Amino acid sequence: MNEAYVQIDCTEGVSYELREQFTFQVPGAQFTPQFRAKLWDGKIRLFNVRNRQIYRGLVPYIVKFCEERKYDWEYENEVYDEEFSLTEAEQFIKTLNLPDKIVPRDYQIDAFVHAIRTRRTLLLSPTASGKSLIIYLITRYLNVKRTLIIVPTISLVSQLATDFADYGFESDKYVHRIFGGQDKESDKPVNISTWQSLYKMPKKYFESFDLVIGDEAHQFKALSLTEIMTKLVNAKYRIGTTGTLDGTKTHKLVLEGLFGTVHKVVSTKELMDQKHLAEFNIKCLLLKHNDSICQAAKNFTYQQEIEYLVLNEARNKFIANLAMSLEGNTLLLYQYVEKHGKILHDIIKDRLPDYKIFFIHGGTDVEVREQTRSIVENEKRSIIIASVGTFSTGINIRNLHNIIFASPSKSRIRVLQSIGRGLRTSDTKDKAVLYDIADDMRYKKKENYTIKHFAERIKLYGEERFTFKIYKIELKG
């Protein structure tokens, strides 16, 4: 076939077994318009019975399927692992002449070696573990004619190119950045792009790439990522990196199918124990709303509850006062720009007119985001008021001391990515605090939506072995 798919030669009966084996219910499918309109049954089928094709990355699962059933199998054109030793990797790294301050850690070298040996893998490595250096080592070692690195946000296009320059690479000469209205064609060997810029491009565009790296792969929309990855028919090297998977089998198998099997690089706890990450504590501030509000809110829809919370004057003043009272640099994350972010910004700016305050959202120019990042790295006290979508993913600010969750979320990926903003260490910081703001609007036995989301976050904090404490606060007004 090609580098995206394999074709399975089997009996019709086995093909139906395979279809059943690789069919999964998509979590939350019942809420989609397609499901409600009865245009989709809410299932994803990874094996196509008609053409007998499946993602190449799922071959290990096909082998397991055969062995469990004692079926005979043969893999034509089987590709064996490359021979690449740890010693060879270390010798190669020396030839890169990395700056003195850049010293690859053992787990980064191990991940680099694993990626080169296997050619296709999904590297599971938490936020702040130094994924950009792993990507750089892979890119430089393979040194193919055309490399495509796909990232989820515009900010990450610039940041990754800047990181490469920090490692000693001539980024301006060899790296082409693609986002927004930028030209997608270039003779430069390394192309860094958002998935949004490429998913509508024709198959011909992708045929020249030999290596594809999907950074923060879990952030891509499944359909768009599939569109891109299945057009990369000649890319024999396929490396994905992700800080976290969403816990569902569907999500994991789709990513493994497009890249390769998951390889766990290191855990957040290990990084903390080794002092590579800041000491991290979570303070959960549970705001108790008055009884009359709770009674009135008991029949709220989810959207009505969110609307009430983001427009609640007492709640917004509480959040603003908290942000203004904290020492160091604070990242305040919100969900809605006009309804919430702007209100919080105006309250804080009005109270602290001479303070370094930054307001970031989806419409903020990429250069402004980069400038903000640079300024905060050298500030002792500032506040960044940023939308979750722009600053929860990949933005690398080491000098952050506090994070405030102003908007409720139960997304495992989004919560862990947001936490990652505070985990990096710097010369002026070795600890960070997350202030998780939750809202208790329970009435009798009726639980409000956002307290259920809070329960999901608490469960996640426990699983990740973070230290957390819950503070109950009466919300006045």
Language-model-detected regions and their locations in the chain:
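Conserved interdomain linker/interface between the two RecA-like ATPase lobes of SF2 helicase motors
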Residues: V266-L331
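Conserved RecA-like P-loop NTPase helicase motor core
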Residues: T244, H361-E463
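Conserved helicase ATPase core of P-loop NTP-dependent helicases/translocases
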Residues: S158, K173-S186, L331, K342-I343, ...
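Conserved helix/coil segment N-terminal to the catalytic DExD/H
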Residues: G180-L211, A222-E227, T390
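Conserved strand-helix element at the start of the C-terminal RecA-like helicase core
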Residues: P126-T127, R146-V157, E307-I347, Y461
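Post-DEXD/H (motif II) to motif III coupling segment of the RecA-like Helicase ATP-binding lobe
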Residues: L211, H218-K283, Y461
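Conserved pre-motif I regulatory segment
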Residues: K43-L46, E76-L124
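Walker A/P-loop
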Residues: R117-R140
